[in-house]
């Protein structure tokens, strides 16, 4: 059972250096990454711009990454230190015992009631048109990292990697996701990681959303994270209000926009994905997840007094695919609205950047008061 329905989105811990510190701030889900197979520098600096008057940001990091091997080493060391602390020893068998669940905690988060998501992407140098090469990039990441994750997140939606969003078309997306699902099923661990795909808020036409849903069902992934940063910019300021010159300049920068102004769009898109991913398609993966999980209707005495997600995986009350909402969520009322629209988890990034380490605690308190 997830202890609460709040998560921290990828980007705050790009290299999986501080997952435990992020868990300590209170979320039930922490997403690290995104990482690429090989190290890459990302885009030149400056590549992040703040808009304090809007509590918003524009970034064009370009998936700067130390590579999947580096992240794997960090996560493996984390598991081995946990195994030693729990009395399993410090050898390879001790690591395997923890990964197989003998410590009584999820093998990724290592914390009861919480899940670690690892976001993966292709290298910028890998040609978008070469789907076999793209698949190899994602599978390489799965092979290195899935042992240490509860959820693998397939990022095909960063606006800062040229051509990446083209992979959200139905045919290439289905092929990529099938490859990732197949690799995840082969992980040497008692329980296999779940697979989710992170989609763009800009791919929002009926045809695009429907095509992505077809790929989700056709590939067997377990859910969707809606969404990512957007290439769109907020509506102009009301008449008589002038942005500081620095922020006016920031709005002209190339990159993905994130902040509270995304919220309405995120909720609307969550509702659309929920409608399309509901019961009419019910292949075996949905039945499996429905049998394993559901939203808890009452908090257990030793659980946090916020909505809990039952089961060992991030799944909702709808009996189909899981949806995480990500984009513009900054308070408890918005988190509740995202859940009511069809999400199981409300994730935050920019809200945490501006709100600090107490943000998740505040949001959960606000949810309790509703």
Regions found by a protein language model. Give the residues of each.
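C-terminal helical cap(s) of enzyme catalytic domains, especially alpha/beta-barrels
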Residues: 42-55, 234-255, 339-340, 345, ...
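Active-site glycine- and acidic-residue-rich loops that bind
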Residues: 10, 123-139, 165-173, 195-217
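Active-site beta->alpha loop and helix N-cap motifs at the rims of alpha/beta catalytic domains
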Residues: 48, 54-153, 158
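Catalytic cores of alpha/beta
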Residues: 13-24, 136, 203-217, 308-318, ...
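N-terminal capping/small domains of soluble enzymes
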Residues: 1-81, 122-124
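Intrinsically disordered, low-complexity domain-flanking/linker segments in eukaryotic proteins
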Residues: 82-111, 279-320
């Amino acid at each position: 059972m997830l202890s609460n329905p709040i998560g921290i989105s990828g980007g705050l811990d790009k290299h999986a250096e501080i997952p435990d510190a992020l868990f300590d701030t209170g979320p039930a889900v922490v997403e690290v990454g995104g990482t690429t197979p090989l190290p890459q520098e990302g885009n030149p600096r400056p590549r992040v711009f703040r808009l304090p008057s809007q509590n918003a940001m524009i970034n064009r990091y370009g998936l700067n990454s130390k590579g999947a091997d580096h992240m794997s080493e960090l996560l493996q060391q984390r598991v081995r230190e946990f195994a030693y602390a729990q009395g399993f020893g410090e050898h390879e068998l001790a690591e395997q015992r923890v990964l197989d669940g003998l410590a009584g905690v999820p093998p990724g988060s290592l914390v009861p009631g919480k899940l670690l998501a690892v976001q993966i992407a292709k290298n910028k140098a890998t040609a978008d048109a070469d789907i076999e090469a793209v698949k190899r990039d994602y599978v390489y990441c799965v092979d290195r990292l899935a042992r240490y994750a509860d959820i693998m997140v397939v990022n095909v939606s960063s606006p800062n990697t040229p051509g990446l969003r083209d992979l959200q078309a139905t045919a290439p997306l289905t092929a990529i996701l099938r490859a990732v699902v197949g690799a995840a099923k082969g992980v040497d661990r008692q329980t296999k990681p779940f697979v989710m795909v992170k989609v763009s808020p800009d791919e929002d036409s009926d045809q695009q959303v429907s095509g992505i849903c077809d790929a989700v069902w056709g590939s067997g992934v377990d859910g969707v994270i809606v969404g990512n940063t957007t290439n769109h910019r907020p509506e102009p300021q009301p008449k008589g209000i002038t942005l500081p010159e620095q922020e006016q300049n920031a709005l002209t920068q190339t990159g993905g926009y994130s902040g509270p102004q995304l919220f309405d769009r995120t909720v609307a898109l969550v509702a659309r994905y929920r409608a399309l991913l509901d019961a009419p398609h019910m292949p075996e993966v949905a039945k499996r997840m429905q049998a394993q999980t559901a939203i808890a209707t009452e908090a257990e005495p030793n659980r946090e007094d916020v909505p809990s997600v039952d089961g060992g995986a991030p799944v909702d009350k709808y009996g189909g695919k899981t949806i995480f909402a990500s984009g513009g969520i900054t308070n408890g009322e918005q988190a509740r609205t995202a859940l009511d629209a069809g999400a199981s988890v409300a994730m935050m990034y920019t809200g945490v950047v501006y709100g600090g380490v107490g943000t998740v605690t505040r949001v959960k308190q606000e949810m309790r008061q509703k």
